């Protein structure tokens, strides 16, 4: 059986668990204890070269260790409801926004968090190699995340959802990054009218609201 190695509440795993909830897919799950460093073990690195969660283990032992890749694989098995787009252009637009969120939202919030959190000393980047924290990068991450919110608010001035007129994984990723990034950087969502309206609408979707 397929199983998902995850850590409840962490941003990247949440991108997959909310996707599963929206699709109505149930998988066996295994909790990985990040605080104890379980993800840095030889055994886990054999499954995930970057020592990151989530990881989807397939029936034959193959591992997928990237949130985007995991969702693409599951979408091929469970095409409805379509969350990665239907037609070629729609799929391309969803991918475009998912990558934009990854580069501008996830990376900026991670930059702010990993370079400032005490528990991340010598782990400013994923993986087992020691990487020192840099205060200036934490400060830059805070600024970059603010720019991310401004730009996303602008996108939502023209369309109902992040990638267009339909709810997709781009909305899931934006929600996850906002929850994580606003907590890390102390940014205030209320300063962005379009974003605030979109957030309330998405946050109140039944599958997402059920998360608790």
Task: Provide a role label for each language-model segment.
Residues 101-203:
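GST-like fold's C-terminal all-alpha helical module
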Residues 69, 73, 93-96, 147, ...:
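Non-catalytic alpha-helical scaffold/packing segments enriched in small hydrophobic residues
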Residues 210-212:
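Short, flexible loop/turn segments with low-complexity composition
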């Amino acid at each position: 059986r397929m199983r998902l190695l995850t850590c409840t509440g962490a941003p990247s795993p949440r991108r997959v668990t909310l996707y599963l909830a929206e699709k109505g897919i149930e998988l066996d799950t295994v909790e990985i204890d990040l605080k104890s460093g379980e993800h840095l073990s030889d055994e886990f690195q054999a499954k995930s070269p970057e020592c990151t969660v989530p990881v989807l283990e397939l029936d034959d032992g193959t591992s997928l260790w990237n949130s985007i890749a995991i969702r693409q694989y599951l979408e091929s098995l469970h095409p409805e409801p379509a969350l990665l787009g239907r037609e070629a252009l729609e799929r391309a637009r969803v991918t475009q926004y998912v990558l934009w969120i990854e580069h501008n939202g996830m990376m900026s919030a991670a930059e702010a968090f990993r370079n400032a959190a005490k528990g991340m000393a010598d782990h400013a980047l994923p993986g087992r190699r020691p990487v020192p924290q840099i205060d200036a990068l934490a400060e830059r991450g805070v600024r970059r995340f603010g720019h991310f919110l401004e730009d996303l608010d602008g996108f939502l001035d023209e369309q109902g959802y992040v990638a267009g007129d339909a709810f997709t994984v781009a909305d899931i990723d934006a929600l996850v990054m906002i929850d994580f990034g606003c907590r890390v950087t102390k940014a205030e969502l209320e300063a962005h009218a379009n974003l605030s309206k979109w957030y309330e609408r998405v946050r109140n979707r039944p599958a997402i609201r059920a998360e608790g």
